[in-house]
Amino acid sequence: MSYRELVVELAREHAEALSDALLELGALSVSVEDADADTPDEQPLFGEPGLVPDRTAWQRSRVIALLSPDHEPAVLLAAAVNDIGVTETPKFDVREVEEQDWVRLTQSQFEPIPIGERIWVVPSWHDAPDPDALILELDPGLAFGTGSHPTTRLCMEWLEQSVKPGQSVLDYGCGSGILAILARKCGANPVVGIDIDPQAVESARQNSERNHAEVTYGLPDACPAGEFDIVVANILSNPLKLMASMLASKVKPGGRIALSGVLARQADEVAAVYARYVDISVWREHEGWVCLAGTRRESH
């Protein structure tokens, strides 16, 4: 059985309403994209947490609806356009989508990832390329962090070089648990992972069990009192700035902190906020992202 995609380009003010109408009329799924994506006219839309976007769609939006074979695209679009009160049906394309083994297709897109000097992130359906390496078995899932994003890679490389056996580590914004698991495999103990998303916490627990890594996970209100030898936070620049005092207070005097989720152009601004508490600078840059690292001063 093959499916069809209905692709419609239209102005910003109608994109959301058309999406809702298509779903109500039986579309299996609907997505809205920037019609100018991958061109010089591409427009960033959503900001970081704590910042309110000023638009809900792009000036030139592309609405893509997945339809079952029993839906006639032109008829469905005409009905949707009528429902939202648009007088003229916009131009559209129809693309055939062949049925596939989606599980196998998805798995084929994720290969083992080498990171740093001896780390491999390996999906469960692959064998480890080097059995003697430091292996993290992780599958793509609901929580962020499989080693493919530059910020995750930067933090992993920093942890590999920085963690010493027996040190305590806090991974704030743990996502999949990848950084906490790596810290534990590097010899850190105890290791704590904190995230605001209960699904991420559960995912991280499962990943730790799969990797035989003893890590304590919880929501922010479960973050233990006291200080850690190492604190790592791979979030985004705005939350990092808002939490600077709290995160810095979790680092022992003389302890170390690493921050990522920060674009190179945001590095100075984030560093300036943390400079009250730690001596911090850009440790490494990769693909436009940076990892900031520093040491908490003994006087604070």
Swiss-Prot record:
Belongs to the methyltransferase superfamily. PrmA family. Its main location: cytoplasm. Pfam families: PrmA (PF06325). It is an enzyme of class 2 (transferase). It catalyses: L-lysyl-[protein] + 3 S-adenosyl-L-methionine = N(6),N(6),N(6)-trimethyl-L-lysyl-[protein] + 3 S-adenosyl-L-homocysteine + 3 H(+). It is found in: Cytoplasm. SUPFAM superfamilies: S-adenosyl-L-methionine-dependent methyltransferases. Its EC number is 2.1.1.-. This is Ribosomal protein L11 methyltransferase. Coiled coil: none annotated. PANTHER family: ELECTRON TRANSFER FLAVOPROTEIN BETA SUBUNIT LYSINE METHYLTRANSFERASE. Methylates ribosomal protein L11. It comes from the Bacteria. The keyword Methyltransferase applies. One of its GO terms (biological process) is methylation. Keywords: Cytoplasm, Methyltransferase, S-adenosyl-L-methionine, Transferase. NCBIfam families: prmA. One of its GO terms (molecular function) is protein-lysine N-methyltransferase activity. GO terms for cellular component: cytosol. InterPro entries: Ribosomal_L11_MeTrfase_PrmA, Ribosomal_PrmA_MeTrfase, SAM-dependent_MTases_sf. S-adenosyl-L-methionine binds at T152, G173, D195, N234. The keyword Nucleotide-binding does not apply.
